[in-house]
């Protein structure tokens, strides 16, 4: 039976959801205790880790962040959980910095849009290689109800949202529910986002501040544009798995059968 999309309460872990229960093709649903999405595990406390293992059967911690993020805020280890690092990021942002004497507004005109970054993460080879590794692990090692995978980036919004959307779209989760899951990240950071926006309006005009807001908020059009790109380029997410990621039709079919009930 399909269930309501909501964040799971933890002491320190935020923006965390089990994809289980989302309705899929053929009247089926994604199996619970299979995939969890979350924000950074940097501030994870022991009780959170125990809950992940006990209640959600988490066996793999899949970290999507770049090396620079890891060095500043490494994941807190969870006993019995295997850590994997697969960097999902297009290189264009890794060394992007504000130039000397440059205003924030001017810097914003040089930055790629978040929508473009989403497309890069499903088209550039470094990100495709990360996705091959991630979904290879999902296909081979994840066991619903026994060995679940938790995947996360810093906020559980963009990179995490892309991985979640690829799972959801592959198995036929309705688009409106995919977007509901994606947009729920804004609830987790609502107070911070409002504070950020007020701060940027002090140093930027409204147009620049609105543009900057795309960097720290989930926006439906960014995910929709990415999914539309996959449809146009590969005929959909299943075609993307076969043509861009290199999985066979039988591997994709077996994966879908494994994670649905």
Place the predicted regions along the sequence by residue.
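Cys-dependent protein tyrosine phosphatase-like superfamily
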Residues: 1-150, 163-261
């Amino acid at each position: 039976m399909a269930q309501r999309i909501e964040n799971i309460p933890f002491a320190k872990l935020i923006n965390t959801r089990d994809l289980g229960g989302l309705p899929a093709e053929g009247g089926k649903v994604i199996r619970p205790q299979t995939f969890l999405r979350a924000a950074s595990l940097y501030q994870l406390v022991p009780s959170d880790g125990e809950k992940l293992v006990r209640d959600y059967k988490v066996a793999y911690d899949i970290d999507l962040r770049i090396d620079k993020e890891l060095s500043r805020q490494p994941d807190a280890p969870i006993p019995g959980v295997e850590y994997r690092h697969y960097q999902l990021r297009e290189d264009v942002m890794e060394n992007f910095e504000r130039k000397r004497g440059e205003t924030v507004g001017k810097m914003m005109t040089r930055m790629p849009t978040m929508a473009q970054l989403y497309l890069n993460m499903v088209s550039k080879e470094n990100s495709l290689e990360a996705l091959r590794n991630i979904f290879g692990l999902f296909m081979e090692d994840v066991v619903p109800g026994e060995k679940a995978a938790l995947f996360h980036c810093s906020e559980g919004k963009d990179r995490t949202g892309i991985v979640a959307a690829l799972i959801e779209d592959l198995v036929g989760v309705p688009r409106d529910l995919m977007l509901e899951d994606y947009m729920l990240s804004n609830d987790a950071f609502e107070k911070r986002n409002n504070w950020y926006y007020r701060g940027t309006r002090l140093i930027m005009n409204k147009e620049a501040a609105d543009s900057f807001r795309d960097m720290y908020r989930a926006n439906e059009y960014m995910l929709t544009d990415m999914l539309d790109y996959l449809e146009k380029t590969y005929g959909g997410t299943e075609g993307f798995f076969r043509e861009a990621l290199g999985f066979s039709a039988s591997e994709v079919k077996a994966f879908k059968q494994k994670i649905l009930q």
